[in-house]
């Protein structure tokens, strides 16, 4: 009987602990959301309340160290904020975030050298984290170190493009063009932004500008790639004959044909289908199938069924 009583007590404790863990699992994300909200509006009192509450729930300090540091930074206790970050970086699962925040706090202090070092450490931890590139670029731009500024903006923009953050991609392309109005990479990213916004007329106008720059800078291969992209834009504008013409010109370049030949055939087939020239549509479909027999028809049907902005 005594043994049964002990078993009941143990089971009750286990259930209690399980329920407590379950409740914590539900409430902790809510507290973190509240903490992030009060961080945004810079309500330090509420921030410290939620930080202390999370600590009491045994949330590991490295997971809330950044919020703790930001709260102290809002109070202008910068050294204490930086020390909190330093103490927790080695045990954090995302040290790049802490290094990045450290850079921000150093920058507020006016310690540009350590800010740069912190942002670079953030990049070393995770080269695919875009924000520190932006902060570095801003510093270099302010110091008139144009090449470094452009290179860091471009590093961030490429990451934004890969992750489909098109608005950021467009905004920081404009930042580069304020430094160098003929930077071809930035112009192409701006064009890509306009294309994704379905602002086809602007994207096409930028395409003509790219064409002129490619000629002036003797970047002929890039000029042919631009023809291909302009062909895509013209297709989405419903200008099928013009699209076919540019796709044909683009395919005359070996590099473009090798890289984009399959897509060129698909767009050309779809354009001819739109023009009701089924013989030529079938011909380019057959060429596309030589590259990917399983995907070609689906690719072309997707093009045919796509809702175009026609802006």
Residue ranges of model-derived segments:
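Register position in tetratricopeptide repeats
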Residues: 40, 74, 108, 142-143, ...
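Residue-level recognition of tetratricopeptide repeat
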Residues: 61, 95, 129, 163, ...
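TPR alpha-solenoid repeat register
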Residues: 64, 98, 132, 165-166, ...
């Amino acid at each position: 009987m005594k043994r049964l009583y002990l078993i009941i007590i143990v089971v009750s404790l286990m259930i209690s602990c399980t329920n407590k863990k379950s409740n914590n699992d539900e409430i902790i994300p809510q507290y973190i959301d509240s903490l992030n909200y009060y961080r945004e509006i810079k309500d330090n009192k509420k921030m410290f309340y939620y930080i202390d509450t999370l600590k009491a729930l045994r949330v590991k300090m490295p997971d809330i160290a950044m919020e703790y540091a930001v709260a102290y930074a809002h109070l202008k206790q910068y050294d204490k904020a930086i020390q909190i970050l330093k103490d927790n970086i080695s045990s954090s699962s995302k040290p790049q975030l802490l290094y990045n925040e450290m850079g921000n706090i150093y920058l507020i202090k006016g310690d540009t050298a350590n800010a740069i070092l912190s942002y670079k450490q953030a990049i070393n931890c995770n080269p695919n984290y875009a924000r520190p590139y932006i902060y570095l670029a801003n510093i270099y731009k302010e110091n008139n170190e144009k090449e470094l500024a452009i290179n860091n903006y471009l590093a961030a923009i490429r990451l934004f493009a890969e992750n489909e953050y098109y608005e950021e991609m467009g905004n920081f392309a404009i930042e580069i063009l304020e430094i160098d109005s003929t930077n071809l990479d930035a112009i192409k990213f701006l064009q890509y932004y306009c294309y994704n916004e379905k602002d086809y007329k602007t994207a096409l106008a930028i395409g003509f500008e790219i064409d002129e720059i490619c000629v002036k800078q003797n970047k002929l291969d890039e000029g042919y790639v631009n023809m291909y992209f302009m062909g895509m834009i013209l297709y989405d504008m419903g200008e099928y004959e013009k699209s076919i013409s540019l796709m044909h010109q683009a395919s005359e370049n070996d590099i473009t044909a090798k890289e984009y030949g399959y897509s060129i055939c698909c767009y050309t087939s779809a354009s001819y289908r739109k023009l009701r020239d089924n013989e030529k549509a079938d011909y380019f479909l057959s060429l596309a199938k030589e590259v990917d027999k399983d995907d070609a028809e689906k690719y072309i049907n997707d093009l045919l069924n796509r809702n175009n902005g026609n802006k």
